């Protein structure tokens, strides 16, 4: 894992610099297409295709661009060609994560994953978001994932910080206290 992070860092930094150096490039839009490319590159069939010595880089490029949901800007195409030409398709998910970290740092925000036992409606998510932003002291980009094992409550992961207010966590704390 550390090796992929080391490989991905220069690509993420170069992409960030290219996005900030060019006028009119929306960092949030760039984050969206980088995440989309990463999701495509994470597909095992695509990785197998990219690793096949009989398949050219241009063929891999055409497949990825063809699978992408939206038209990629020229910057994205140039970036993708560079990654493919250097044989780093497997590093795209890590490149996307590091690029997102750079963008978040520049905006003073962080990504937060809210694990909930039940779906959260927009109003509840807004309330949770406001509370979490006060708790963590920064603006958060929330994403919600369902985890029925929590029984109730939420578990929030922001970087390496975890806030667990789930029923499951409380039950485990009680169990530990009773068996101690």
UniProtKB/Swiss-Prot annotation:
Stated role: F(1)F(0) ATP synthase produces ATP from ADP in the presence of a proton or sodium gradient. F-type ATPases consist of two structural domains, F(1) containing the extramembraneous catalytic core and F(0) containing the membrane proton channel, linked together by a central stalk and a peripheral stalk. During catalysis, ATP synthesis in the catalytic domain of F(1) is coupled via a rotary mechanism of the central stalk subunits to proton translocation. This protein is part of the stalk that links CF(0) to CF(1). It either transmits conformational changes from CF(0) to CF(1) or is implicated in proton conduction.
- Give this protein's Gene Ontology molecular function annotations: proton-transporting ATP synthase activity, rotational mechanism
Q: Name one GO cellular component term.
A: plasma membrane
List the taxonomic lineage.
Bacteria, Pseudomonadati, Pseudomonadota, Betaproteobacteria, Burkholderiales
Please give the chief subcellular localization of this protein. membrane
| Family annotation (SUPFAM superfamilies) | N-terminal domain of the delta subunit of the F1F0-ATP synthase
Report whether Protein transport shows up as a keyword of the record: no
Q: Which InterPro entries match?
A: ATP_synth_OSCP/delta_N_sf (IPR026015), ATPase_OSCP/dsu (IPR000711)
Question: Topology versus the membrane, per the UniProt entry?
Answer: Peripheral membrane protein
Name of this chain's protein: ATP synthase subunit delta
